């Protein structure tokens, strides 16, 4: 069970339904989310759900979806904020972890929903992402997150 990894990509969507935008760095604000993202302004599909400050997905999971289901997800279309590599996100539910200087706590798995399925219009995407759709987390201590930052359990 890998307990350290790296941020490989950062995406924010300025409003619900808008395409995600890739950024090199973003400010994470405790209890709010990532500046410039729909959830920061409480505008996302799950804005009323506890622990939707930031979402993460493993690059390894995306590679598995492509391998097992022949679905190639372009960067950011999965609508998760941070793409990581080298850390088992499913093991971070109810665990505090650090992304660079940001302290987070895993809240729940980010299982695929009908909203993602309809947004992508890709047959089988919901099934393909079950148990590998990533992690929802709350931000406990804010700071700037940048591509290349280390992700580690505390």
Question: Can you describe what each PLM-predicted range is?
Answer:
Residues 1-154:
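Metal-cofactor-dependent catalytic cores
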